[in-house]
Amino acid sequence: MRVAAATAAAGAGPAMAVWTRATKAGLVELLLRERWVRVVAELSGESLSLTGDAAAAELEPALGPAAAAFNGLPNGGGAGDSLPGSPSRGLGPPSPPAPPRGPAGEAGASPPVRRVRVVKQEAGGLGISIKGGRENRMPILISKIFPGLAADQSRALRLGDAILSVNGTDLRQATHDQAVQALKRAGKEVLLEVKFIREVTPYIKKPSLVSDLPWEGAAPQSPSFSGSEDSGSPKHQNSTKDRKIIPLKMCFAARNLSMPDLENRLIELHSPDSRNTLILRCKDTATAHSWFVAIHTNIMALLPQVLAELNAMLGATSTAGGSKEVKHIAWLAEQAKLDGGRQQWRPVLMAVTEKDLLLYDCMPWTRDAWASPCHSYPLVATRLVHSGSGCRSPSLGSDLTFATRTGSRQGIEMHLFRVETHRDLSSWTRILVQGCHAAAELIKEVSLGCMLNGQEVRLTIHYENGFTISRENGGSSSILYRYPFERLKMSADDGIRNLYLDFGGPEGELTMDLHSCPKPIVFVLHTFLSAKVTRMGLLV
């Protein structure tokens, strides 16, 4: 792995670390349409390019015995056999539809022999490509149907059809060349006798990175094909590579998130819009770790650019004094509780501004999207309650997690998050702690009405001056109690509506009815105290 120059943008803020960008290239496997296919992966500073490898076929399991046994059988064989090697779970498009059932409708019935009449066009011939032949111990199979040509217009042929005869000439024992010549000499009107073979369809329909790998914003580079009946000849191959370029900006690289990885060989790359997931498999654990670190490093190196774009977008359209600078934004995983008590990690995008902690399910590239987070929590009422290792492994060690608690009118809201690296954990820990303290200094004070000893009063907590309890008298107010923070001996709440404060004064413990859940003000008080202690150098 080669490392490029440092790339962190100047002025990105103290929360942003200096990152270097990695370059890397090598062979990996890609889960594409429920199959593992070999691709050449090339990592640059801003993108990951995947190129279909010509040797990918070597990774594919050999066709099952059903296809070979077809030769010589009057009606074809093995329709009910299955192919080995298919993964139990895939993220690509579904497999081709099942062939028509037999007359009785049984799922295992052998597909019928069909007779199809095709009229050749002046240019393009039948418009099919074929594979197989006696020398390959395979039937003659339709491997490609070219859009708009004769076979396609007939609407009666499909990929995976075995050609049994052409104008009455039996092709069950034909070699590939014999089949090609029979199709070429067939004249303008061609009567084909065909039968669908389900087992070979996944292998005939070779996955294409361009068409089968959905990814918003990816740049495709697609091969073009000739319209000949003989797809096996080198003269019909086009040198253009089947290639997909994945922009890394605001992608989420993860391990052991959406797919089990018992061998620690998988890497997951989630798109910024959360709609697509790319799964890569490496040859061993060490290689997977190396690739993951490189991809993750480059994604993180792009964050200063993302922050600059976000702040420019928000600042350009906000009203005077209403802008909230985005301090940090990145993907991580949040623990979600499912029915039956089960738990699951799911991707979540967390952003920290001057005053708020925001959670999104996709990257908010527009101001409207930014204004609609899934959750929004004031930093001054939020605290970090855990940061460290868990019990399971996202890559080579235990889970790295941190938890937040926020005081709200509904009580305490808790979130457990998982990060992928120790550097991420340290970064988020620092950002949240410093962000909460900075929010306390920025907000300065909170004030709310409440009941004390049966009368309406106002409780004000000021970051510098401490506590003030006052009573409104017409247009003026009178101060009942004023205490600095160091006079607070005890604070508590009942979790419902009452806040208890004891300053050691002659009035004793004050019971304040807040008319709603006291947790928000309790958490603000904790943040003020924590920020002041840290500022005094008593807590690092």
Swiss-Prot record:
InterPro entries given in the database record: PDZ, PDZ_sf, PH-like_dom_sf, PH_domain, PHsplit_syntrophin, Syntrophin, Syntrophin_4th
Keyword annotations of the record: Actin-binding, Calcium, Calmodulin-binding, Cell junction, Cytoplasm, Cytoplasmic vesicle, Cytoskeleton, Membrane, Microtubule, Phosphoprotein, Repeat
Primary localisation category: membrane
Compartment annotation: Membrane; Cytoplasmic vesicle, Secretory vesicle membrane; Cell junction; Cytoplasm, Cytoskeleton
Superkingdom of origin organism: Eukaryota
Modification after translation, per record: Phosphorylated. Partially dephosphorylated upon insulin stimulation.
Region (Calmodulin-binding): 518-540
One Gene Ontology cellular component: nucleoplasm
Region Disordered: start-end pairs: 73-114, 220-240
Ranges of Low complexity composition bias in the record: 81-92, 103-112, 222-231
Residues in PDZ domain copies: 115-198
Modified residues (Phosphoserine): 95, 110, 129, 211, 222, 233, 393, 395
Domain (SU): residue spans on this chain: 484-540
Membrane topology of this protein: Peripheral membrane protein
Described function: Adapter protein that binds to and probably organizes the subcellular localization of a variety of membrane proteins. May link various receptors to the actin cytoskeleton and the dystrophin glycoprotein complex. May play a role in the regulation of secretory granules via its interaction with PTPRN.
Domain free text: The PH 1 domain mediates the oligomerization in a calcium dependent manner. The PDZ domain binds to the last three or four amino acids of ion channels and receptor proteins. The association with dystrophin or related proteins probably leaves the PDZ domain available to recruit proteins to the membrane.
Subunit relationships: Monomer and homodimer. Interacts with the other members of the syntrophin family: SNTA1 and SNTB1; and with the sodium channel proteins SCN4A and SCN5A. Interacts with SAST, MAST205, microtubules and microtubule-associated proteins. Interacts with the dystrophin protein DMD and related proteins DTNA and UTRN, and with the neuroregulin receptor ERBB4. Interacts with PTPRN when phosphorylated, protecting PTPRN from protein cleavage by CAPN1. Dephosphorylation upon insulin stimulation disrupts the interaction with PTPRN and results in the cleavage of PTPRN. Interacts with DTNB.
Protein known as: Beta-2-syntrophin
Biological source species: Homo sapiens (Human)
Taxonomic path: Eukaryota, Metazoa, Chordata, Craniata, Vertebrata
Gene this protein is translated from: SNTB2
